Amino acid sequence: MIKVLIIESGSFKNIGGAAKDSLELYKYLSKKPDMQVEIYGSFEELGYKSRTRLDSIYAKKFDILMLNSIRDVPIAEKYISLHEKVACVYVDRGDVLTHHAHAPAKRLLSKAIGLIESRIEPSRLDKATTEIASRSESKLVKAARNYASKVYAIRLFERLKKFMSCYVAINAEQALLARKVLKLKAIEYIPIAPHKEFRKIKVKKDYAGALYVGRLEETQKNVSFMIKGVYRTKKEHKELAGKELLRIIGEGPDEQYYKAMVSRLGLQSNISFLGFKAYGELVKQYNNCGFLVSCSRWESFGRVFIEAMMCGVPVLLNDRNNKLVSVEPERYVVQDRVTGLVYHYNSLRDFADKFYALYSDSKLRARLSKNAYAFAKSKFSIERTYEKYYKLFKDLASRQAQSP
């Protein structure tokens, strides 16, 4: 019997994202006769209350720990200090390896944190800066919070490397980088796949505009750029006055900042804030929109891109967060002018041009929609993803049993 603990108490506590993945993987693995699985985290919004308490974890014996958030490293660190022959699997949903590899200044600062963390717990400082940034409208404060958060994540990754048994990449770029810089035998590439709820359904289509789905925060999601892009599109095409061009689904610390920005730019009739939507309503919104839009500064994968394509929706995104999903043949999440359109990062001109093209050209949308759906159906399967984790855990448990 292989005993697995899935830890999901970090930065993905809301419905969707890693929390949904972890809970569904837990249910899948629990049906396997050779698996005994427990899950720790906050899943109430998904209709499940975990019976595993943090204080009970350390007394139990698990063969494998699975981490989905870098901020759960302290839990795994303490557990492994108390038990032998434990394999730790880290799923890099936050693209921490990429930040670590390409940010030497942040690595130096993270080492400085290492010198003082025995006296000052960095997690408290991280939480405090997050709260300050969420109450501020200053771009400087938000940028400082973003920088501090990455430094803290890099420090946690340094600590994780001392006991990590397996690194799981969720895009092909991560996998290539991991094989270059990590001294690990177990490096796996297991892409995120959309859940079964995301599919084509019949709806009364009455909206050809864009849909944004995600957190309402500036440091990563860059929603202010999207609002400015819609403003520019409207300004250049007078026939769009009064038209609904963008629907925003999601919640987050910068929500009021974005609403004030929309009001200041006179876009109240063009941009709608729909708030949080549960899966059933979200699938309807995907199926009713013309295209999905993203302006993120970075994405480790971009789950919403594949969710949209599974619903037959093309995607507009920038070249910075369009991740590689396969090397041979070379394929990106979005293939420009095949499954969506890709604009140059931070170019309002290019964004506005491509936004208008997707909004105004129904034939273009139809062609991209057909291709996007075919690509998503052929490339991504939640069953294959879960089966890969099952096989990985069996392999790791076998290696642990054979080690001296």
Q: Which role fits each region the language model picked out?
A:
Residues R297:
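Aromatic "clamp/platform" in nucleotide-sugar-dependent glycosyltransferases that forms part
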Residues L176-R179, K185-A208, E281-K284, R399:
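Acidic anion/phosphate-binding donor-loop and adjacent secondary structure
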Residues K202-K221, I227-R232:
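Conserved donor-binding/catalytic core segment of Leloir-type glycosyltransferases
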Residues P314-L324, V334:
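Short hydrophobic beta-strand element within catalytic cores of glycosyltransferases
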Residues Y257-K277:
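Nucleotide-activated donor-binding/catalytic signature segment of Leloir-type glycosyltransferases, i.e.
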